[in-house]
């Protein structure tokens, strides 16, 4: 099963304490606050409730912004179907995907906690959150694809 994000957004704490609403997901810090990125999928993950999830693969594209060299995107699961009113909260770290600007790559997720939390309905999306500094700053496309392998 393949799911595409409905949209991506960035919550900026420490300066604006609000969502950027420009269609990108960002991490790190680059003058406009501590950036935490999210991809939202609406209720798409609810179709997987009760299934045995064996593998998840998320494909991410890094846009221009910040250093052009590779930055480690720290991918985490979250339980929000859409943009919350305040800062997002994350559940479990899925892994790190290193991308330079203009690159697209796929992170395989086999963390048993995340797989079981997708099945139980607790995980509804993914995001990126790393150290809040310029060396970890990255801007990603709001459009990501999640491929999920499961059995009934």
Each model region followed by its residue ranges:
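Cysteine-clustered segments with highest specificity for TGF-beta superfamily mature ligands
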Residues: 86-152
């Amino acid at each position: 099963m393949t799911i595409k994000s409905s949209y991506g957004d960035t919550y900026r704490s420490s300066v604006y304490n609000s969502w950027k609403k420009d269609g990108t997901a960002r991490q790190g810090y680059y003058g406009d606050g501590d950036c935490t990125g999210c991809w939202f999928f609406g209720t798409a993950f609810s179709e997987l409730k009760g299934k045995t999830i064996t593998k998840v693969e998320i494909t991410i594209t890094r846009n221009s912004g910040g250093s052009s060299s590779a930055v480690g995107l720290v991918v985490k699961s979250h339980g929000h179907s859409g943009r919350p009113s305040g800062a997002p909260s994350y559940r479990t770290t899925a892994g790190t995907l290193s991308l330079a600007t203009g690159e697209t790559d796929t992170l395989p997720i086999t963390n048993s906690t995340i797989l079981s939390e997708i099945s139980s309905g607790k995980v509804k999306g993914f995001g990126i959150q790393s150290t809040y500094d310029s060396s970890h700053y990255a801007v990603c496309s709001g459009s990501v694809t999640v491929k999920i392998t499961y059995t009934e």
